[in-house]
């Protein structure tokens, strides 16, 4: 049924329909009786799916990835739709408009999206106010990025300001140095640049801190970031962000859409490779959150057994619809029982053991 609805929705420009659908989801989950009704049907209630990760209790492993709810307007929404948590942002220390539109595109033959949003958001102070007056029945993480006008040498202070404002209001923080849509941002993934940023954020908050990395990094750079994360005592790594690669795309005209990061199935293979490499490198020293191209419960199960304690999706939600998260949760719960696991944690990394 959603397939027919999706065809109609896809007749509207991507950013516009995103706003309309998001507004509709918020409206549908604002009345408490409606939200409770949806939660009974869609939320992960099976205890086998629950886990405690970096001291936070997650009712299910699948979260909403950063980028969908940049300013925390739907904090009350995501648990009722089946997500075990949500990651807000990316938010920057200063409010900024992002890149000029059009800046979001569909690649339907690839079931993918291309975006060059450029961290459009209302700023960390505004998100802090929003979180202070909001409530959620699932953990809420916050993804923080660098303000575009901030010079690279001032990046540590910029990230630290967001951490200061948001740390106490979030279940965890993610330092985003991997978006391809802010000039020079990915250069901050070098250990020399990343160390002072992470150190500055850690100095501002006792909330668990993770770093989000790009799929386009060389393997040696992934190893270096993993080692740095362990050294500094980070809670974990989010792998991966969108890719700038255009290899293997099937959608006609995709090459003409211009700059931006691609999410969905085109990044899945590399996201899994990075996850496996990270797990082999750090084992249980860090929590690994896998994101990128997860569409089915089989995909989710593969990531969990490869070492992911938590998962995230955005593009899969766009193409899969409102029942997507529940289908992932139901499939993972079935696989846990089929394979004799009593808890989700027992399955994490089991394919590598």
Curated annotation (Swiss-Prot):
Residues binding substrate, per UniProt: 70, 115-119, 176, 181, 241-242
Pfam family, one: DHO_dh
Keywords: Cell membrane, Flavoprotein, FMN, Membrane, Oxidoreductase, Pyrimidine biosynthesis
GO cellular component: cytoplasm; plasma membrane
Positions that bind FMN: 66-70, 90, 143, 176, 212, 240, 264, 293, 314-315
Root EC class: oxidoreductase
Cofactors required: FMN
PANTHER family (UniProt xref): DIHYDROOROTATE DEHYDROGENASE (QUINONE), MITOCHONDRIAL, DIHYDROOROTATE DEHYDROGENASE (QUINONE), MITOCHONDRIAL-RELATED
Protein task: Catalyzes the conversion of dihydroorotate to orotate with quinone as electron acceptor.
Family: Belongs to the dihydroorotate dehydrogenase family. Type 2 subfamily.
Protein name: Dihydroorotate dehydrogenase (quinone)
Name of encoding gene: pyrD
């Amino acid at each position: 049924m959603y397939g027919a609805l999706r065809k109609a929705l896809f007749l509207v420009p991507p950013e516009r329909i995103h706003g309309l659908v998001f507004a509709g989801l918020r409206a549908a989950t604002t009345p408490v009786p409606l939200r409770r009704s949806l939660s009974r049907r869609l939320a992960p209630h099976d205890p086998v799916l629950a886990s405690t990760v970096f001291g936070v209790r997650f009712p299910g492993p699948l979260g909403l990835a950063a980028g969908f709810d940049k300013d925390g307007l739907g904090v009350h929404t995501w648990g009722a739709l089946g997500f075990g948590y949500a990651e807000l942002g990316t938010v920057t220390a200063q409010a900024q408009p992002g890149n000029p539109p059009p800046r979001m595109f569909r690649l339907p033959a690839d079931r993918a999206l291309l975006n060059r949003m450029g961290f459009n958001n209302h700023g960390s102070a505004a998100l802090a106010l929003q979180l202070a007056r909001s409530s959620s029945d699932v953990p809420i993480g916050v993804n923080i990025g660098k303000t575009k006008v901030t010079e690279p040498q001032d990046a540590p202070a910029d990230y630290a300001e967001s951490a200061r404002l948001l740390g106490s209001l979030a279940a965890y923080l993610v330092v985003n140095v991997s978006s391809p849509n802010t000039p020079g941002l990915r250069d901050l993934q070098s250990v020399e640049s990343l160390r002072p940023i992470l150190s500055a954020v850690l100095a501002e908050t006792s909330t668990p801190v993770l770093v989000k990395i790009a799929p386009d990094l060389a393997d040696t750079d992934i190893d270096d970031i993993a080692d740095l994360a362990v050294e500094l005592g980070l809670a974990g790594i989010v792998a991966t962000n969108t890719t700038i690669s255009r290899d293997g795309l099937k959608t006609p005209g995709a090459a003409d859409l211009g700059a931006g990061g691609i999410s969905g199935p085109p990044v899945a293979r590399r996201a899994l490779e990075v996850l496996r490499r990270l797990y082999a490198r750090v084992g249980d020293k860090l929590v690994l959150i896998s994101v990128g191209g997860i569409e089915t419960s089989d995909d989710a199960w593969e990531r969990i057994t490869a070492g992911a304690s938590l998962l995230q999706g955005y593009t899969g939600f766009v193409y899969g619809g409102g029942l997507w998260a529940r289908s992932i949760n139901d499939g993972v719960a079935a696989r846990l029982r089929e394979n004799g696991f009593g808890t989700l944690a027992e399955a994490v990394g089991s394919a590598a053991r």
